[in-house]
Curated annotation (Swiss-Prot):
Belongs to the YihI family. The lineage of its organism: Bacteria, Pseudomonadati, Pseudomonadota, Gammaproteobacteria, Vibrionales. Keywords: GTPase activation, Ribosome biogenesis. Interacts with Der. The keyword Mitochondrion does not apply. GO terms for biological process: ribosome biogenesis. Residues 1-73 are annotated as: Disordered. This is Der GTPase-activating protein YihI. It holds the Pfam family YihI. HAMAP family: GAP_YihI. It comes from Aliivibrio fischeri (strain MJ11). Residues 22-32, 55-67 have a biased composition (Basic and acidic residues). One of its GO terms (molecular function) is GTPase activator activity. It comes from the Bacteria. The keyword ATP-binding does not apply.
Amino acid sequence: MSRIKKARKPGMSSQPVVVTRNRTDRDVESRELKRKRKRKGLKAGARNAESNAEQARRNAQKKDPRIGSKKPIQLVVDAKQKTTKQERRLTNEQELAMLENDAQLMVLLDRLDSGENLGTGLQKYVDEKLARIEHLMGRLGLLDDEEPEEIEEFPEFAERKAKSDDDLLAEFDDFNMDDFK
């Protein structure tokens, strides 16, 4: 048999059938996985370095939080002073304002004004708070009723302040020590 040479002229043979494939996501993923399986290990050369995102992720895991702190550190340790009772204690004005704005006390006072009888515990609470308010107002000078009595308690001291030096000398000369025996 003699050999027949193939010719490349159009129309000689039937037209090649063009097959178009619709590639799905699954096909694309399977090809990528196959490519990764073939290429195990690291890429050759320094120019094929890891991506920056992966490097940052690895460095973040290894980073020690104690290293690189910008917070200033005191070289001399000062002993912390505990706050004293006076520093923790409220001033008279603050305590008075707090008692005057006490919601529970106001409700109980309204109940008393309406003629309702309170229990012994609540009545005791109201009495204590009102006594404390009165005491604080007296300390702050907001109550004028009690102050004149305290001043008049020692009238001889008030008179001595008004005397002159000559009067005091005369009183000293007339002083009798036998009165105190």
